[in-house]
């Protein structure tokens, strides 16, 4: 058995320092004079323990961390996309993560998203509170450990930093994590470690690397044990064209050994298994050799995990990023079953009605589904690959069920030409983005605006609560129809509504409303108009000074009360309550009250049951 280096991924919001941190880690180790230096892999950088020791100084000893690991293996591509693409059975390929954030800005949308992804994958992580050099008054010392750098700051600057750290602590607490600045942590097993750093100046980098090693020793002892002579297992990072080589597969190996001429199996975008034979294994040349030979790669016969390698092999056009890769020299059927079970292992709880989800890799599909689930968004289907005509048709079927589910959420995939043609003939929505958070936010914002549109449409189709007052000395005609000057006391009144008095008696129907010779279809509170009331007789059905109410059915009342009340003005709500009192006194004491006697449901047939609701 051999102990491999922990695989580390860096996540965080855009422009919060992910790439700068990785560049600085690489840069400081390249500049190191220690023997060995860094090892550059395909898609990754391995920093050996002797280099880490030279950076961390006495911190490893102070934290009682033994130098038993070979080093740290950093995934070069930062962010959610790489993290979710690099997955294996049971979670992320990354053993550890750095959640980086701008200490001057705190949590941002993608920070929350990264935290949710780490939470769902159960990946141990350290928080890097970056850009301490941007705190007003901070006195930077390049490459200094934080513990010394903070001693060189004015007390007001230290206070300012503490305030920002505790804002992060508070937000993490709200998200279900207890945390503290690394030098104040009382229990490393139960608290997330926050390390203030500057990815630009390198301040705090010694403590950050030390905390990562501490996490590795605490959580990963068994996980890092690998069999050197076992057939390799890995994850496809990317399939890409290389000049002079054709299509190649960039892969991260996390277990076993990979040999030239091995037969390997992977998954395609259609979730089928392909088998191919390795023609070449390539690793990056050292930087000085690249400068001399002008070629970036060198052949090797064998690669041992953990490692990043470029594989040259035929028939890999349809291999999907994020696919597991396994050596299958002897037991093809077993390996094929294992690969197919990887797809089944992404447990997607689908619904009869819901949205369609498309993504480019198994990992990104899993991450997207997890976030949609956390927001209670139902999913009809979730698949890898570009949006097809069939997807558009299926989404249009969902649209017929409910407009808000006639939607495709697509992460980092394209719309096929045949699907574009079909899309032009349908009412469905397609949301495309390379940021999962943005996709979910765009969809939820669209749903909310659609709900608002539906509410406005419904509000326009129902009878709104309103009351009027017959103005004294302004009755112009006594009957057929009665015409009087009225003041609108609340709400909006429309032509065609029925008026009742405070005893619940029907007065008549509004036939027309006029102001300065202009016919008005509806008028609102504060208006004074001449109103023609059909079937009403002055002094029989109403008198000067009477207050009349717009009548409505109980169904109309429930529709407003249950769905549209937030769209009414206060005066309309009061009028509706007055109308309910009138109805309860004159018609039914339970008018407008939801019946909570569930026993009567047992006697209803299906149609009556629907009417009940």
Swiss-Prot record:
InterPro entries: EFTU-type, P-loop_NTPase, Small_GTP-bd, T_Tr_GTP-bd_dom, TF_aIF-2_arc, TIF_IF2, TIF_IF2_dom3, TIF_IF2_dom3_sf
Region (G3): 76-79
Residue ranges, annotated region (G5): 198-200
Protein name from the UniProt record: Probable translation initiation factor IF-2
Region described as G2: 37-41
Record-linked NCBIfam families: aIF-2 (TIGR00491), PRK04004.1 (NF003078), small_GTP (TIGR00231)
GO molecular function, one term: translation initiation factor activity
Keywords: GTP-binding, Initiation factor, Nucleotide-binding, Protein biosynthesis
Keyword Nucleotide-binding part of the UniProt annotation: yes
Residue positions binding GTP: 12-19, 76-80, 130-133
Function: Function in general translation initiation by promoting the binding of the formylmethionine-tRNA to ribosomes. Seems to function along with eIF-2.
Family that this chain belongs to: Belongs to the TRAFAC class translation factor GTPase superfamily. Classic translation factor GTPase family. IF-2 subfamily.
A cellular component annotation (GO) from this entry: cytoplasm
Superkingdom: Archaea
Region (G4): 130-133
Species: Methanosphaera stadtmanae (strain ATCC 43021 / DSM 3091 / JCM 11832 / MCB-3)
Residues in tr-type G domain copies: 3-220
Stretches for region G1: 12-19
CDD domains: aeIF5B_II (cd03703), IF2_aeIF5B_IV (cd16266), IF2_eIF5B (cd01887)
